[in-house]
UniProtKB/Swiss-Prot annotation:
GO terms for cellular component: host cell nucleus. It comes from Human bocavirus 4 (HBoV4). Belongs to the Bocaparvovirus Non-structural protein NP-1 family. Residues 192-201 have a biased composition (Acidic residues). InterPro entries: Bocavirus_NP1. This is Non-structural protein NP-1. The gene is NP1. Signal peptide: none annotated.
């Protein structure tokens, strides 16, 4: 066989794929198609899941908000819209008893210390943070110094209270005001006790101090 005829046969085989080559090509294209389709289905499934998840989140948020609103309405209805703490009780008592002694007692001092801590956060600590912050941030060293400053202030208040109770066990003012608040607690109807928020405590104290100065 001549070399020329061999070359022509080779060219012809390259131009016209054999049945076996066609079958292999078909199988390869089918495999590629199958490998891509799960990705599309998975993507579509993920989009569907994300949409469904967003709907669930909105529904959960709405349900939580509705439950919170209902709980708040129930709480307001139960409490009758009146919430008391030692400051409000003592202020009302003094308004009706002009000869009442100066403030003192466990309930008075414990509430006063709580007020001091709240006032320290909302006023002094906030002001110091604003002075020291850079882009709304402070370093750990600065945070530590602020915390120790607050701790020193609170520690001194507790030491003063403990010193008074230790060295004045028979303080008549303590007995008087503790008795006033105990009687108030005894007369309160059997409702769930409600914790007074820091903002409410601070507001009550400021109002009380204003009345005392007048």
């Amino acid at each position: 066989m001549s070399s020329e005829s061999t070359k022509n046969r080779h060219r012809s085989s390259k131009r016209t794929p054999s049945p076996l080559q066609k079958e292999r090509k078909r199988n390869w294209e089918n495999r590629k198609s199958r490998s891509r389709s799960p990705i599309r289905r998975h993507g579509e499934k993920n989009l569907e899941y994300a949409h469904h998840n967003n709907q669930d989140n909105r529904q959960s948020s709405y349900t939580a908000s509705k439950t919170s609103d209902q709980a708040m309405k129930t709480k307001e209805k139960t409490s009758g819209g009146t919430r008391t703490n030692p400051y409000t009780v003592f202020s009302q008592h003094r308004a009706n008893h002009s000869n009442a002694p100066g403030w003192c007692g466990f309930y008075w001092h414990s509430t006063r210390l709580a007020r001091n801590g709240t006032n320290n956060i909302f006023n002094e600590m906030k002001q110091k943070f604003q002075e020291l912050q850079i882009d709304g941030k402070i370093s750990w060293d600065t945070t530590r110094e602020l915390l120790f400053t607050q701790k020193k202030t609170l520690d001194q208040g507790y030491r003063n209270m403990l010193y008074h109770f230790r060295h004045s066990p028979d303080c008549p003012r303590c007995d008087y005001w503790d008795d006033v608040y105990r009687k108030h607690l005894a007369n309160v109807s059997s409702q769930e006790s409600e914790e007074v928020t820091d903002e409410e405590m601070l507001s009550a104290v400021e109002s009380m101090e204003t009345n005392a100065s007048n």
